[in-house]
Amino acid sequence: HGNVEFITNIKYLEEVLNGDKSKTILDIGAGTGAYSVYFDKQGYKVTAVELVPHNIDVFKAKNSNVDIHQGNALDLSFLPDESFDVTLVFGPIYHLMNKEDKFKALLEAKRVTKPNGIILTSYYMNEYAVISYAFMKKHILESKGDLTEDFHVINKPDDLYSMVRLEDINEYNELAGLERIKIIASDGPSDYLRVYINALSEEEYAEFIAYHLSTCERPELLGASSHVLDITKKK
């Protein structure tokens, strides 16, 4: 079945864009271009920044009109201030291990976004990582040194992913001067239920998506989702 996170993020991005094709999009940490190419095909002007050369090669092979740059989310100095209506920060934040770098990436995203623009940031959540890795996969005993007393994952410099809790995200927004419009559980329970979801018929899966989209803003589901999408504007 389709990717629940992608379906959800597209729905909220389309709400933000509201069909206005004059709005410009910046996709920071664009990967192989899933979101960039989708909105390019819808007729939006999209600029993408990606760090990894292999990803850029795959992206370019998709033959889109996206303006693709190799670059780092921590330094977008090749892009002018206040030049994009909608800025996506879907990959970088959970690949940056320390708070200073996350803060720097958010500040760069904010700098290149227009005064009335919207910044959408994806985060990888702590509870999903602990439940799925430490307990479902039975790594808890050897993982104890990687967790604080209250079970927050300790991010180490050579880790691939950095996990956060909602209060961490609130702190980053406060530091970066971003004001939340809304926050969404992009995957909801889907990553826990993958085996069951994959066994659903197309009709049943459509009902699951309807359920998820009707509940993904509920506060009680946010922290347990594998990812959240934070939709913010400049203060």
Summary of predicted features, one role per range:
Residues G33-D75:
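Class I SAM-dependent methyltransferase SAM/SAH-binding core
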